[in-house]
């Protein structure tokens, strides 16, 4: 008899209690089990073999035997569910737990990790929020952008030093006289559904993208896209753009079927990258290695990310036979790898290419004066906020920020003189642990100085939409930025396409910012973008439009059998190259 059938019978006798010997007869046990005495003896024997109970029968009719139940029903269910999870029978495990998703999630975390079968590596992770649809043409948070990079390829990529590298296009060139960028595609490219990718595919896709508000500003200077032959795409611009290849190396320019752009609310997506999406629902995201990937096939076969809504889940991890828990913590994303009895361990830490900062909103009903902005900047200095976190015993693994990127020189500003603050100050941000805690800390400081503070937290997309349609009217806006792997182009886009930043600056300052960025785009090589953007960011800070606070520290800890685990810009482990020597 299967363990699941035995469980049903065990549930019937659990009423006698666990851990205490009782004297009973076979007939009495049979009555509890709703079966015959003969079948009852068989059931008791099978349960005893599994150590669920201890049965000491006495010979003779109506002799009272000894029965001891060894395990609580809840513990038994967990044990059986755990076995099913390890076998990949997730629906059965959930049924055993009576559809208790919280318990199911906790068991998932204890079993997540890597499994190696005949050299093939499968990864299972847990994450505490549901992923949005993995498509490039929607605004996404950091984790979704990481998965965009796994599911889609661009025409080209750009290294963190700004050097452009081939992807679906093997060569490219820029005609400075005619403002034309030409890309030459590899032959034999296909999407995950085996549909061919050629120049017409790219032209159709970019025609669709150009019509979307999400792309209109970045692609406004593209006047024509043509396909002279199936492996050649030509972009004609109306103004110079030396870094255009870097722009389209961004995750939002991942190559997808043009028809997918019009499809909404369908998680079954078709990409062109190293992994394909085989399942995506409210419970999990499952990726499978794509054998038709243009480059070397990834080393991992399957990656499953289970959604576990557990507020206690703070630290992500990755390992073999060990918990993998990935979540956005107060200090960004941390990845810890723990393997029992591991013979070696390692740790990598890096300061993110990004920043958590406050914006002073010019579109609020009563905009702050320069003196007030300067004074508040002093009041909410990150060192002061850090002291508040320490008093509250809140772990905040971050570096104090004096500019928007840690590689940029600190912006030194004079201390703000005391200024009368508004009676009411409103703070907005998006629903992210670090922003919520910063908002509460800032509220505490400003309340001490006589202001009544109200905090509103929007969804990530809602915050951007309110800025775009002009209805974001809170006094202070808390947000953050984090560069993708194409650092130079990503930094540019984080300024140029940032609805929230442009909205808070007001029309005059926004025009100034546009002029500076257009100048960068026209005359600066991609590899020099970060150098060119630094004085622009520093000016916004020195004029008290932006108040930098923290750079998050990203950490990857691991013990055990996995080889060459590295940390990506998004704070997630590089699942493409994880492998095991076992």
Predicted stretch roles:
Residues 145-174, 251-272, 362-367, 407-413, ...:
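Short, solvent-exposed loop/beta-turn-alpha elements that line the ligand-binding surface or hinge
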């Amino acid at each position: 008899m299967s363990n699941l059938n035995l469980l049903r019978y065990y549930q019937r006798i659990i009423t006698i209690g666990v851990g205490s010997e009782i004297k009973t007869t076979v007939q009495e046990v049979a009555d509890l089990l709703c079966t015959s005495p003969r079948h009852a003896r068989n059931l008791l024997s099978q349960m005893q073999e599994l150590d669920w109970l201890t049965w000491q029968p006495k010979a003779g009719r109506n002799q009272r035997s000894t029965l001891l139940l060894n395990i609580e029903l809840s513990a038994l269910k967990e044990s059986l569910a755990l076995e099913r999870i390890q076998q990949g029978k997730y629906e059965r495990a959930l049924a055993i737990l009576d559809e208790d998703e919280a318990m199911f999630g906790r068991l998932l975390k204890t079993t997540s990790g890597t499994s190696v079968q005949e050299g093939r590596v499968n990864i299972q992770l847990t994450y505490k929020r549901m992923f949005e649809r993995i498509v490039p043409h929607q605004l996404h948070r950091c984790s979704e952008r990481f998965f965009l990079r796994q599911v889609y390829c661009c025409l080209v990529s750009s290294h963190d030093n700004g050097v452009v590298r081939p992807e679906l296009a093997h060569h490219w060139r820029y005609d400075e006289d005619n403002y034309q960028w030409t890309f030459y595609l590899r032959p034999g490219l296909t999407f995950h559904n085996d549909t061919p990718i050629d120049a017409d595919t790219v032209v159709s896709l970019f025609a669709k993208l150009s019509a979307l508000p999400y792309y209109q500003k970045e692609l406004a200077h593209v006047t024509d896209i043509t396909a002279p032959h199936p492996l050649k795409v030509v972009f004609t611009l109306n103004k110079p753009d030396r870094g255009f290849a870097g722009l389209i190396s961004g995750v939002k320019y991942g190559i997808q079927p043009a028809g997918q752009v019009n499809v909404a609310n369908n998680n079954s997506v078709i990409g062109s990258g190293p992994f394909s999406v085989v399942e995506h629902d409210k419970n999990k995201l499952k990726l499978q290695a794509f054998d038709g990937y243009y480059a070397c096939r990834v080393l991992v076969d399957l990656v499953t990310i289970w959604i576990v809504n557990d507020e206690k889940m703070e630290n992500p991890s990755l390992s073999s036979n060990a918990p993998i828990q990935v979540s956005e913590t107060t200090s960004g994303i941390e990845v810890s790898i723990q393997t029992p009895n591991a013979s070696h361990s390692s740790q990598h830490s890096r300061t993110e290419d990004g920043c958590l900062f406050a914006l002073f909103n010019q579109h609020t009903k009563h905009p702050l004066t320069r003196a007030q902005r300067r004074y508040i900047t002093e009041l909410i200095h990150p060192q002061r906020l850090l002291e508040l976190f320490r008093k509250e015993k809140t772990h905040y693994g971050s570096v104090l920020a004096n500019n928007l990127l840690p590689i940029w020189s600190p912006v030194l500003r004079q201390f703000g003189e005391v200024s009368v603050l508004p009676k009411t100050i409103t703070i907005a941000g998006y629903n992210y642990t670090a922003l919520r805690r910063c908002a509460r800390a800032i509220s505490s400081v400003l309340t001490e100085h006589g202001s009544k503070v109200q905090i509103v937290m929007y969804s990530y997309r809602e915050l951007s939409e309110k800025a775009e349609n002009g209805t974001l009217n809170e006094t202070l806006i808390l947000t953050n930025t984090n560069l993708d792997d194409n650092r130079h182009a990503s930094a540019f886009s984080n300024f140029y396409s940032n609805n929230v930043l442009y909205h808070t600056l007001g029309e005059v300052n926004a025009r100034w910012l546009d002029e500076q960025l257009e100048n960068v785009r026209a005359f600066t090589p991609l590899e020099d973008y970060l150098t060119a953007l630094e004085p622009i960011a520093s000016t916004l800070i020195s004029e008290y439009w932006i108040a930098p606070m923290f750079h998050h520290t990203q950490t990857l800890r691991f013990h055990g059998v996995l080889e060459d685990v590295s940390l990506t810009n998004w704070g997630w482990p590089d699942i493409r190259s994880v492998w095991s020597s076992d």
